[in-house]
A protein has these predicted regions:
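Helix N-cap/loop-to-helix boundary motif
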Residues: 26-27, 64-72, 89, 107-116, ...
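Alpha-helical solenoid repeat scaffolds used for protein-protein interaction
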Residues: 227, 235, 244, 258, ...
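Catalytic cores of enzymes
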Residues: 418-826
Length: 826
C-alpha cells in the first residue's frame, strides 16, 4: 500500500512537471512568434505578421493568460497590425480597447498610458487617410483619448491633433475651430516647449474670428501676433507682412478705412522689398489696397492701384477686371465698364467650366457652392441697375443669368449639360423665339435677409437688339404677401409690383406667348393667375409658359407621346412592419445593381417633422383609380403600374431610376419645411437643410423606424428632395405631384431648394406642382380632367389649362384658391 501511494505521488509529480515544461514550451513559442511578427512587420509584411501574431495569441489563450499584461501587449500589437496592415479600424479599436482594459486591471499604469497614446495615434493615422468630413470623428476621438492620459497637456501629439483639427473645422464649424485653438493655447502654457509656434496659434485664432465675423476679437489676437513679430530679433519680415495684411482686412470690416489702408501699404512695401514688383505677393497687396480705397470711396486712388495690379503679370485677372468694371461704373465710363465686365465674365466662365468638368458628380455641388461668388455667378446688379439703359450690360447680364441660374441642377445632369453652357447666350434664346413671343428671365440678388433686395426681369423679344431690364422691389412683394394669407385675383398690388411695368416694357399684345423663368419669391406665386386692372387674368390675356430657364424653350416645343405610366395614391402610411419588409424586399431583390447610397437607414433627426402629417388620404385612391381607368382606355399607354395601400413603398419608386416611365403621378402627403431666415447657417447649409426637409410620404412611412431598429434594411418611407436628385428620371416626360406645397422651397442662390428642383435635377421634362395646400375634391377634379384632356390628344399645357378652366367654370371650385395654385413647369 505504501509503495502504491509513493508511486502515485511520483506519477503526479511527473505529470505536473511535464505540464509545466509543456506550458513553458508554449509560452516560448508564443514569444518567438511575437518576435517573428514584429520583424515581419518591420520588413513591410504587416498582413502576414498579423496572422503569425494571432497564432501567438491563441497559444496564450490555451495557457489561460487572458488576464495578464503579456496578453494585453499582444492585443495591443494585434490592434496596431490590423490598422497598419489592413486599415481595419473596427478590429484596431476593439483590440486596443481590450488591451487598455487589461492593463488597467493589471495596474500597469505606464504601459496603459502608452497603449492609450498608440490608440490615439492610430486614430489620427486612420483619419488622415479618410475623406472630409468622415475623418473628423476619428480626430475627435483621438483627442478624447489623449485627454484621458494624466499628463496629456504635455504631449506633443496632443498639440498637433488640436492644431490639425482646428484647421479642418474652419470650413464647417468655425466656432469649433476657435474652441480647439484656445484649448491648444492653454495646453502650450503647461510645457516649456511646443513644436507649434504659439504665435501661429494666435494667428489662426485671429483668422477664425475674422471668418466668424467677430472682428474685435480677430483684431485683438492679430495685434498680439503683429506686436510680437515686430519685436523679434531678427524680425521675420514675411510674417510681419502677412499680419499687416490681415490687420488691413479686419480694419476694413470695421469700416476704419484709414487704418486698413495704412496696414495694407505696410504689407505692400514689405512685399515689394522681399519679392519685387513682378511677384504674386506684390500683385495681391496692390489689389487689396485698391479694394480698401474703393470701399473708402476714393475711386481715383482705387483705379490707380487696380491698374497697377492688373498690369502685373501675377495679378488675379478676374477679380481685378471685375473691380475695374465697378470703378469705371462709378466714374460713369460705360465703355470701359463693359469691357472689363465682359473680360471678367469670360475668364471666370472658362475657368469655371474647365474645373467643373474635371470633378466627379458628387464633388461638383461643393465646388459650385464654394465658388459661386468668386467666379461671378451672381448678377452684378450694382452695374446693371446703375446703367439700366446700357444695351451691352443688359446682354451681359442675360448671359450671366443663363449660366448661373440652376447651375447645380446642370451639374447633376452631367457633362453634356455642362458643355452646352459654354456657348449659350442671349442670342441663342432670341433665335428660339418666334415672332410675337417674349422670353423673360427673372433674377434676384441673394442677401442674408431673404425678404429684402432687388428682383430684376430681363425681357427679350425676337426683334430687339438687346434685352431690356425691369426692376422689381422684392421687399414690396413680401410686404404685400404678408398683408394677405395668399395671393388672390383681386389683390391689385401684386399686379402693380410684378406685371405692370413688364407688360409696358415688353409691349405685350393680347395672345402673345411669354416664357417666364422665375426666381426667389416669384417662383412660389401663381403670377400667371393674377388679375389686372381690367379684372382679366394675366394668363388669359397672354399665353404664359413657366420654364426652369429660357434655355428650355426648344424642349417645351417637343411633344412626346406617353407610352408608360406609374401611379401612386391611397397609400397606407401605417403599413405593418411585416408588410413593409415584404414589399420592400420585392423591389430591392429585383435589382441588386441599384446604387447603395440610395438606400438609407432611419437615423436622422427630421423623422418627427416629416412624419407629423400622416392622415390617410381617401381622395387620392379615388383620384388614381380614375386616372388608371382613363389611361387604360388610351391607345398609346401600353403599361400602367398602380401602387396603392401597402404596395407603394419607397423602394418601388427608387427602383425605376435609369428606366423611368413617361408619366409619374404621385398623390400623397407633401412636406416642405424651410427656415424663413438663414440664422447661423451659410447658404450651403441652408440649401442642404431645405433639400433634406422636403419630401413625399410613401407606404409605411410611420413604421419603417420600427423595422430599422431591428437591423433590417428598408427605406424610411420618406422620399426626400436630396434623394430624388440622385436618381435618373431622364426618360420621364411628365411628373404630377398631387400633394400640398410641392412647388415651394427654400430661396437660395442656387435655385428654389425643394421638390421641383430635385425632380428637374433628376432629368424630368415637365412638372405639375402646387404652391399651397390643396383641396382633396378640387384636386381630384383637376387631375381627372387633365388626364382626360391629355388622352384626347391635347398637348400637356393645353390639357392643363383646360383642366384649370374646368375648375374655374364649376360652381363649387370657381374660387381662385382652388385652381390657381396648380402650376406647370417645363
Amino acid at each position: 500500500m505504501y509503495r502504491l501511494i509513493v508511486s502515485l505521488i511520483a506519477s503526479l509529480i511527473c505529470v505536473v512537471c511535464f505540464s509545466q515544461v509543456n506550458d513553458s514550451i508554449k509560452l516560448g513559442q508564443a514569444i518567438s512568434l511575437h518576435d517573428k511578427a514584429i520583424k515581419m512587420h518591420e520588413s513591410g509584411k504587416s498582413s502576414d505578421a498579423l496572422v503569425v501574431l494571432q497564432d501567438a495569441l491563441a497559444l496564450l489563450d490555451s495557457l489561460h493568460m487572458k488576464k495578464t499584461s503579456t496578453y494585453a501587449v499582444y492585443r495591443h500589437d494585434i490592434g496596431m497590425l490590423f490598422l497598419l496592415g489592413n486599415k481595419d479600424i473596427v478590429s484596431f479599436e476593439r483590440n486596443m480597447q481590450e488591451a487598455i482594459q487589461l492593463k488597467q486591471m493589471c495596474s500597469d499604469e505606464s504601459d496603459c498610458n502608452y497603449s492609450k497614446m498608440c490608440y490615439a495615434d492610430g486614430l489620427n493615422y486612420y483619419a488622415s487617410s479618410q475623406p472630409f468630413p468622415k475623418n473628423l470623428q476619428y480626430y475627435e476621438k483621438a483627442i478624447l483619448i489623449y485627454e484621458s492620459i494624466p499628463y496629456y497637456e504635455s504631449l506633443e501629439r496632443y498639440h498637433l491633433s488640436l492644431n490639425d483639427l482646428s484647421v479642418l473645422y474652419k470650413d464647417v464649424n468655425i466656432s469649433k475651430s476657435i474652441d480647439l485653438s484656445h484649448k491648444l493655447l492653454k495646453a502650450q502654457k503647461s510645457v516649456s516647449f511646443s513644436s507649434i509656434d504659439s504665435l501661429k496659434v494666435n494667428s489662426n485664432i485671429s483668422a477664425f474670428y475674422l471668418e466668424n465675423g467677430d472682428y474685435e476679437e480677430a483684431l485683438y489676437y492679430n495685434n498680439i501676433v503683429l506686436n510680437a513679430r515686430e519685436s523679434q530679433i531678427p524680425p521675420d519680415y514675411d510674417k510681419i507682412r502677412i499680419s499687416n495684411s490681415r490687420a488691413a482686412s479686419i480694419y476694413c470690416r470695421l469700416n476704419n478705412y484709414e487704418k486698413a489702408i495704412y496696414h495694407s501699404e505696410k504689407s505692400r512695401e514689405l512685399a515689394l522689398k522681399l519679392y519685387g514688383k513682378e511677384s504674386v505677393e506684390y500683385a495681391r497687396s496692390l489689389q487689396n489696397t485698391s479694394v480698401y480705397y474703393l470701399d473708402k470711396g476714393d475711386v481715383v486712388q482705387a483705379l490707380e492701384y487696380t491698374k497697377k495690379a492688373y498690369n502685373n503679370s501675377f495679378g488675379d485677372k478676374y477679380d481685378l477686371a471685375h473691380n475695374l468694371a465697378t470703378i469705371y461704373s462709378k466714374l460713369n465710363h460705360l465703355d470701359s465698364c463693359y469691357f472689363y465686365a465682359k473680360e471678367a465674365w469670360e475668364m471666370s466662365k472658362d475657368l469655371y467650366l474647365k474645373n467643373l468638368q474635371q470633378l466627379s458628380l458628387e464633388n461638383r455641388f461643393h465646388y459650385v457652392c464654394s465658388n459661386r461668388v468668386s467666379f461671378g455667378l451672381t448678377l452684378p446688379t450694382d452695374l446693371l441697375l446703375s446703367h439700366e439703359n446700357s444695351e451691352e450690360l443688359c446682354r451681359l447680364a442675360y448671359d450671366r443669368i443663363l449660366f448661373g441660374k440652376n447651375l447645380i441642377m446642370d451639374c447633376m445632369l452631367g457633362d453634356e449639360a455642362i458643355s452646352k453652357l459654354k456657348s449659350i447666350n442671349w442670342n441663342s434664346i432670341q433665335s428660339y423665339l418666334n415672332k410675337g413671343e417674349v422670353a423673360i428671365e427673372f433674377w434676384s440678388d441673394k442677401s442674408e435677409n431673404l425678404n429684402i433686395g432687388v428682383l430684376i426681369a430681363l425681357v427679350l423679344r425676337k426683334e430687339w437688339s438687346s434685352p431690356h431690364v425691369v426692376k422689381i422691389s422684392k421687399d414690396k412683394i413680401y410686404r404685400t404677401l404678408n398683408n394677405i394669407e395668399q395671393a388672390t385675383e383681386s389683390y391689385l398690388p401684386l399686379y402693380e409690383n410684378i406685371w405692370k411695368d413688364i407688360i409696358e416694357v415688353a409691349q405685350l399684345q393680347k395672345g402673345e406667348k411669354v416664357y417666364i423663368s422665375l426666381d426667389d419669391i416669384l417662383a412660389q406665386i401663381p403670377i400667371e393667375s393674377i388679375c389686372g386692372y381690367d379684372y382679366n387674368y394675366v394668363g388669359d390675356k397672354y399665353d404664359i409658359v413657366r420654364v426652369t430657364s429660357t434655355r428650355n424653350i426648344p424642349i417645351v416645343r417637343e411633344q412626346k407621346t406617353p407610352y408608360e405610366a406609374i401611379l401612386y395614391g391611397g397609400l397606407k402610411y401605417d403599413t405593418s412592419p411585416v408588410d413593409i419588409q415584404k414589399e420592400s424586399s420585392i423591389h430591392y431583390s429585383s435589382n441588386r445593381s441599384i446604387q447603395e447610397n440610395l438606400f438609407e437607414l432611419m437615423t436622422d433627426s427630421i423623422v418627427s417633422d416629416l412624419r407629423s402629417t400622416n392622415k390617410y388620404l381617401p381622395w387620392t385612391k379615388e383620384e388614381v383609380d380614375s386616372i388608371y381607368t382613363i389611361l387604360s382606355n388610351s391607345k398609346t399607354i401600353k403599361n400602367i403600374r398602380l401602387y396603392e395601400e401597402e404596395k407603394g413603398v419607397e423602394e418601388s419608386f427608387k427602383i425605376i431610376s435609369g428606366n423611368s416611365p413617361s408619366i409619374i403621378h404621385i398623390a400623397t402627403h407633401g412636406v416642405s419645411i424651410h427656415p424663413i431666415e438663414l440664422n447661423d447657417m451659410n447658404w450651403v447649409d441652408y440649401y442642404s437643410y431645405c433639400m433634406e426637409h422636403s419630401g413625399l410620404l410613401f407606404s409605411g412611412a410611420l413604421n419603417t423606424n420600427v423595422i430599422n431598429t431591428d437591423g433590417l434594411k428598408v427605406e424610411d418611407g420618406i422620399l426626400r428632395s436630396n434623394e430624388i436628385c440622385l436618381l435618373d428620371l431622364s426618360k420621364t416626360d411628365l411628373v404630377v405631384l398631387s400633394a400640398c406645397k410641392t412647388g415651394t422651397g427654400g430661396v437660395t442662390p442656387f435655385g428654389l431648394a425643394g421638390l421641383q428642383w430635385a425632380f428637374k435635377a433628376a432629368g424630368v421634362k415637365t412638372l405639375i406642382l402646387s404652391l399651397s395646400d390643396v383641396d382633396d375634391a378640387a384636386t381630384h377634379m383637376m387631375m381627372v380632367s387633365f388626364y382626360h384632356n391629355l388622352m384626347q390628344g391635347y398637348s400637356k399645357r393645353e390639357a392643363f389649362k383646360k383642366a384649370q378652366k374646368a375648375l374655374r367654370d364649376s360652381e363649387e371650385f370657381k374660387s381662385f384658391n382652388y385652381w390657381a395654385n396648380f402650376v406647370m413647369l417645363d
